[in-house]
A protein has these predicted regions:
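N-terminal secretory signal peptides that target proteins for export/translocation
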Residues: 1-11
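Bacterial N-terminal signal peptides
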Residues: 14-28
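Mature catalytic domains of secreted/periplasmic carbohydrate-active enzymes
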Residues: 30-347
Length: 347
């Protein structure tokens, strides 16, 4: 990328950012959150226009390929799309070594891009935990890798002055109490018995994992829920869960993906008028899927990302860029390259 192009991108970004801040001050993009405590805790987030989400875990091992067959869609949906039984998928833990994982290198790449916050995975749809939970053996510390990913990354983020949050999926294809499964469910191939499963007991498991995350890993800026769509907010005890989270860390931000209003809207596409009446962010990926795809060659150009960033800023929102480290624990070269290029534009 030429220096002239980089300069034009930086000018565009700064001009649009100034315009977006002016629009916000005039009440153009969204109404202010009325509660004073909510205003206080989200103040820093309103100023941050650009975040990164890491999509990584056990699903990076197959990398969208199962038994030699390539599957489309996000890499963290490989178990669903390939219809892999829970026990067969769990056997992947014996192969999880991530020899190239280096939290300092990850943090440097994030800083190179000029991002203001980072979302780290704690538990994805497959139920695999990237922290040392005492409530399950299906976790990263029980693999040959043996290290507490979330501990190392959270410590590194604080040392490098990077605000961070954790991604947590309600959907869990591994936990025996998570429902539905079996016939007449989205996963008819999951033949584990359901007569002893108890969804309320599963939600208690979620609450206890919230306690682990919010009492053992220091201050966390954002709790990024996902995967709540198979149950109603009442079935997920959403209000109770958020109250529990607020009791543990009153200043934490929570998105709206439990089906109840949170501090901000987490969107998957660019909003049109009327714009959301609360703070919002839009998620995109550096390629055509979320997470690591072993056969991927279709990468977005940095110019496309900066255009999306500028558009989000102009509308009063944030861009959340999703990236997928590979099974070795390293950022693929196209990811590192584009993060640096984006950083040249934003600076």
């Amino acid at each position: 990328m030429s220096r002239a192009v980089s300069h034009r991108g930086a000018v565009l970004y700064r001009a649009v950012l100034c315009a977006s801040l002016l629009c916000c001050s005039m009440g153009y993009s969204f109404s202010a959150v009325s509660q004073e405590p909510a205003d206080a805790r989200i103040a820093w987030w309103r100023e941050a226009k650009f975040g990164v989400m890491i999509r990584w875990g056990l699903h990076a091992l197959p990398g969208c390929v199962w038994n030699g067959i390539r599957f489309q869609g996000p890499s963290d949906w490989i178990q669903f799309r390939a219809r892999v039984p829970s026990s067969e998928y769990a056997a992947l833990t014996a192969q999880f070594t991530a020899p190239l994982f280096n939290p300092d290198e990850w943090a440097q790449s994030i800083k190179d891009a000029g991002t203001q916050y980072l979302i780290l995975p704690a538990k994805s749809y497959d139920g695999f935990c990237l922290f040392d939970s005492a409530l399950t053996d299906f976790k990263i510390t029980a693999t040959p890798f043996g290290r507490d990913f979330l501990r190392e990354m959270s410590d590194t983020c604080r040392r490098e002055h990077i605000r961070f949050g954790v991604y947590y999926s309600i959907l869990d294809w591994h936990h025996p109490d998570y429902l539905p499964r079996g016939p007449d469910s989205p996963r008819p191939w999951d033949e584990r018995p359901t007569d002893t499963a108890d969804y309320d007991r599963y939600i208690d498991y979620v609450k206890r994992q919230m306690e682990e995350l919010l009492t053992r890993y220091g201050p966390i800026d954002i709790l990024w829920f996902d995967g709540a769509w198979e149950h109603t907010p009442a079935e997920n005890h959403a209000d109770e869960l958020i109250r529990h989270v607020r009791t543990l860390q009153p200043g934490i931000l929570v998105n709206n993906r439990l089906g109840v209003p949170g501090d901000f809207h987490a969107l998957d596409s660019m909003p049109e008028h009327p714009l959301p009446d609360r703070p919002w962010e839009m998620s995109i990926s550096l390629h055509d899927t979320y997470g690591y795809k072993r056969y991927d060659v279709e990468w977005k150009e940095s110019s496309e990302i900066i255009t999306q960033l500028a558009t989000c800023s102009a509308k009063g929102g944030h861009l959340l860029l999703n990236i997928g480290p590979d099974d070795s624990g390293a950022f693929p070269p196209p990811v590192r390259e584009r993060l640096k290029q984006i950083g040249e534009w934003t600076r």
